[in-house]
Amino acid sequence: MLGIRYTGLLIAPARPQHTRESSKEPMTREPIYSSSEDPKDDDPKLRPLRLEDMVGQRDVIERLMIAIEASKQRNDVLGHILFDGPPGLGKTTFATCIPAELGVSVEFLSGPTLKAPKDLVPSLTNLAERQVLFIDEIHRIPKAVEEYMYTAMEDFRIDLILGEGINARTHNFKLKPFTLIGATTRAGMLTGPLRDRFQIREHLDFYSLDDLTEIIVRNAKKLAIEITDEAATEIAVRSRSTPRIANNRLRWVRDFAQSRAQGKITIEVANDALEMAQIDSLGLDRQDRRYLDTLIRVCLGGPTGINTIAATMNTVTDTLEDEVEPFLLRSELILRTPRGRVATPKAFEHMNFEPPVSGDGQIGLFDNH
C-alpha cells in the first residue's frame, strides 16, 4: 500500500522515491502543548494557568467564564473565540487558560506558517473532541487557507480530493467538534466572513496602573525576589500599560538587584536599573524615542506618512504600527491624521524640543483628530 500525503486540497498516493529511505515519510506538524505550556514564553512560571489567576481584563474574563460554564452545562463545544488588541496584553495567556478551564489541551499554530490548506489539514484532522486550536497572528493567513477554514469552523468538516486527474474524487471528512481561538493585532485586516464565524469576539485594552502593579508584585514573589510597593509602582509606570513589558522589565530589575543591590528591589534600585536600560519616566524605550525624534526633528513634527518615518528609521512599518504607535497614541504623544502622523505638544515637551508656535495647520489637525 502506497503512503498518503497531503498536497493542498489534494490527497494523492505518494510516488516511490529513488532513495535508500522509505517513501513513507512522517507528516510534519506543529507540536501540541498542554494548557499550562506555551512555546513563546521565556519564563512560563509567570503565566497564569487559570482565568481566576489573571489580573485585569475583568469584563472579558467574566464573559468568558459565563460562556465556558454554559458550554459545560450543555455538554457542548465552546464557541470559537477571537482576541484582538496590541501585543503583550494577554491574548496567548487567554489561549492557555481557556483550555485549562475546559480540561482539554491546546495546539499552537502561527498564521504566517500556514502557507496553504495542506499546512492546516494535519492539525484539523488530529484534533480531539472539544480540543482548542490556537492560531496566533490569524490576520496573516492567506485567502486560500481562510476559505478552507470556513466549513471547518461552521460544520466541523473539510473537503478532500483523493487521487489525481480523472481518478480524483471528493471526500467529505468529518472533524471532531473543536474550539478555534484566533489572536490578532490587526482586527481590521480580517475579512468579514472569517470574523463573523467567531461567536465570541473580545478586544483587549491596555492595563491600568493598579492592575500592572499587582501583576509585578505577584510575579516578584514567583521570581523569589523582594520588592517594595514603591518599586513595583515605578516599574509599572514605566511598562507602557502592558503586562509582557512589565514582566520583561521586572526580570531586568531583578537581575540588576541581584548583581548590584543585595537582591532587594527598592525604588532606588528600580530607578537605577531602568535608567541603565534607557527606559524613561513615561516608559518609552530607545525605539520609541527614536520614533519621536524622527517625527519631530527630521520631519518637523509632521504631518508625515508612516512609510517615511519607517524608511528614515530603517525599520518596517508593521513594527511601528503594531509595537510603537499604539502606546504613543494612547499617551497622546502622536496623532494619526488623514495627512499623516503628527507630534503633539506633549511629545515636543517630553523630547525637550520647543513646540512650534504656529505650523502648517497644526492647530486644525489637533482639533479635528
Give the positions of each predicted feature.
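Conserved C-terminal helix/linker of AAA+ ATPases
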Residues: 256-278, 288, 343-345
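Pre-Walker A (pre-P-loop) alpha-helix and adjacent loop at the N terminus of AAA/AAA+ ATPase modules
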Residues: 42-80
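Conserved AAA+ ATPase core "coupling" helix
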Residues: 190-222, 229-237, 248
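Terminal-proximal interaction/regulatory segments of ATP-powered molecular machines
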Residues: 298-369
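The conserved phosphate-sensing helix
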Residues: 239-252, 264, 284-285, 303
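Walker A/P-loop
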Residues: 73, 78-109, 124-128
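AAA+/SF3 P-loop NTPase mechanochemical coupling elements
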Residues: 164-183
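Conserved AAA+/SF3 P-loop NTPase catalytic/coupling segment centered on the Walker-B
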Residues: 117, 131-161, 187-197
